[in-house]
Amino acid sequence: WHSNDRYRRTVWQCTRKYHDEICRTPHLTEAQLRGKVVSAMQRLSDDRASVLRTAESIRDSVYGTSALQDELEQVQRDLAAQAEKLNRAIRTNASVAQDQAEHQQKMKKLTARYQALQERYQALTEEIQGRDSRRAGLNSFLRQLKKLPETVTAPDAITLHVLIERITVNADRSIVIRFRDGTEVVERL
């Protein structure tokens, strides 16, 4: 508002303000929002030891990939064995006269099994990548939390981005600040 004069200020408002139903959430100035974020981050800093313990246990138990890696290796071995069976069936068909209907039936089964293994391999790979990505995000959160000063005054943009996942303003004038470790802090306007 007042974009070209000395009274300029940034106001945050709901993105659904002009839809069919008018949104009842309050407008916030940059200063109000920053104050509530600093307050929430101070509460997080005060409870740092507990948050670090919880987040590290989550990181190791939920985002661990060793069991998935073992299963992925087994699926890779099964894929190689299944590919060899397919190649053997093709070579046998080329060198030995046999009933083609029976051969086609056998090839369908072998191919279906191979495709199922490929799908499982793909699913495991995606799950491992997702867990690794979430683990890396949690590691960044933990590093940034350890760097957070005892008294939070004015956090920089990188700290805000790494620590905060989402900020929700409700119609009852409460602000829910969700940190990347799942912790939520509720502030009042």
Give residue spans per PLM region.
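Amphipathic alpha-helical coiled-coil/heptad-repeat segments
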Residues: 1-189
